[in-house]
Amino acid sequence: MGQKINPLGFRLGTTQSHDSIWFAQPTNYSENIQEDKKIRDCIKNYIQKNIRISSGVEGIGQIKIQKRIDLIQVIIYMGFPKLLIEGKSQKIEELQTNMQKKLNCVNRKLNIAIVKVANAYKHPNIIAEFIAGQLKNRVSFRKAMKKAIELTEQAGTKGVQVQIAGRIDGKEIARVEWIREGRVPLQTIRAKIDYCCYTVRTIYGVLGIKVWIFSK
């Protein structure tokens, strides 16, 4: 049987890099991982509550965390950075204070930076959010998948694959539907493939969305 490996972990050190960069003693390792999860969840929740564009996409491409003894540096890569436009400094300060309360940062400075992504629809996270928004609005899954593939092709990718699993269109039996356009060489380690696994809650139940994008 074919064994499926995570495309990002498979390419670490060649075309992919770690999202979190820090060193820790074995006793503190789990605490640092939990802290990273809290940071990511806090950012996503804040953006969900405060910033939403019309299509329902939050627009977070990637969140990178770098830690030192006295500093936590968080870099948010956004496709549609509403944070950058309206009251940037005020909203970033609000997000920082929210995060500091949750993390109990003692003797450590928290610094948040927002970077605009050049081609938003080259990021699988943003594509998955777009499909999730369409499915929540009861758009046909085929239409949502085709539209997502159109958007990635316009962004200049070499290939894209989208998969949706679950009770699609409210059918009683769960199934898996997928579509591929262009090349997606999953076995080639030097191929730059971005991957995302996203969960969306609809009125019929939970659907899983997976997106593979071959950029170069």
Curated annotation (Swiss-Prot):
Q: Which UniProt keywords apply?
A: Chloroplast, Plastid, Ribonucleoprotein, Ribosomal protein, RNA-binding, rRNA-binding
- Which InterPro entries does its entry note? KH_dom-like_a/b, KH_dom_type_2, KH_sf_prok-type, Ribosomal_S3_C_sf, Ribosomal_uS3_bac-typ, Ribosomal_uS3_C, Ribosomal_uS3_CS
Q: Which GO terms describe its biological process?
A: translation
Q: Which cysteines are joined by disulfide bonds?
A: none
From the Swiss-Prot or TrEMBL record, state where the protein is found. Plastid, Chloroplast
One Pfam family here:
Ribosomal_S3_C
Per the record, the domain of life is Eukaryota
Provide GO CC annotations from the record. chloroplast; cytosolic small ribosomal subunit
Q: How does it assemble?
A: Part of the 30S ribosomal subunit.
Q: What is this protein called?
A: Small ribosomal subunit protein uS3c
